[in-house]
């Protein structure tokens, strides 16, 4: 990639905005009547969308018409990618750099364009929080405001519940390799089935759940498509930890106790609920004001 000194002001703007995003998000950058992708994103996007890869000077690029963006975004999400939409915030003026901002970050479990969603079922983002043989599960549909959490015992019961609700995207503690194996269609080892939920907090913010995307604690740590139909994303372990998750959920609902939600001593369920809220607000920068109950 070219250095900042070699870039035009617009391309330097692109690089700055790109650097502030989750590392696995493709950036669609509004440029007139098109959304453009540049550098590595252009190479990836051109391959996934089967569009022409061209160059702007020495910079690889590909573009899609702004009026067809929903269809193209749907294809990227179906391929398991996150997509950041960067729009022009003012009219273009000769000789001046247009102000641009990321207006939304979409993922397979949070896309709500009605034309892309199947009306017969929810479009859930789910979180899995393991604590020995207990699994905390949380499900969010931003389209409807549905927010549910539960606990189940054993690998089979966890998979059964996940397959029943069929989330489009699923996050789990990234260091829990056995859980990843299970969610990919394998099984966990006996040692991991006995492992309790780690009582850790964020090293950077004291467990307050406010880390920005790209900083420690707000990072995506690997994704994969699965035979179950969901996109699997590893996420930082501390986000699922009891103290952090409890703080995150209480802060969201503006309460001092979760007893009224039926979550007393439901540590794994709270871990999943806190993780899914953190992923939405910190990693994807989404507005979750419509999640008013659980």
Report the location of each language-model feature.
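A cross-taxon signal for low-complexity, glycine/charged-rich
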Residues: 197-199, 203-210, 215-219, 224
């Amino acid at each position: 990639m070219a250095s900042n000194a070699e870039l035009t002001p617009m391309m330097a703007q692109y690089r700055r905005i790109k650097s502030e995003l989750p590392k696995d998000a493709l950036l669609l950058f509004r440029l007139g009547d098109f959304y453009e992708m540049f550098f590595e994103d252009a190479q990836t996007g051109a391959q996934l969308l089967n569009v022409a890869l061209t160059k702007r000077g020495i910079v690889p690029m590909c573009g899609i018409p702004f009026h067809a963006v929903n269809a193209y975004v749907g294809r990227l999400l179906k391929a398991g990618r996150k997509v950041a939409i960067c729009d022009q915030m003012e009219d273009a003026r000769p000789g001046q750099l247009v102000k641009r901002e990321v207006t939304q970050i979409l993922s397979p479990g949070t896309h709500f364009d009605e034309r892309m969603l199947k009306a017969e079922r929810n479009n859930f983002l789910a979180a899995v929080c393991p604590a020995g043989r207990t699994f905390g599960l949380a499900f969010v549909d931003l389209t409807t405001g549905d927010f549910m959490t539960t606990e189940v015992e054993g690998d089979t019961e966890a998979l059964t519940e996940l397959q029943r609700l069929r989330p489009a995207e699923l996050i789990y503690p990234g260091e829990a390799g056995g859980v990843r194996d299970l969610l990919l269609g394998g099984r966990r080892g006996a040692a991991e089935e006995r492992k309790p939920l780690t009582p850790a907090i964020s090293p950077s913010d004291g467990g307050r759940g406010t880390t920005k995307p790209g900083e420690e604690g707000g990072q995506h740590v690997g994704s994969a498509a699965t035979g179950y139909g969901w996109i699997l994303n590893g996420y930082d372990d501390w986000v699922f930890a009891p103290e952090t998750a409890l703080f995150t959920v209480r802060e969201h609902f503006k309460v001092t106790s979760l007893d009224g939600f039926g979550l007393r001593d439901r540590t794994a369920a709270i871990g999943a609920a806190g993780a899914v809220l953190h992923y939405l607000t910190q990693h994807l920068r989404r507005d979750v004001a419509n999640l008013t109950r659980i």
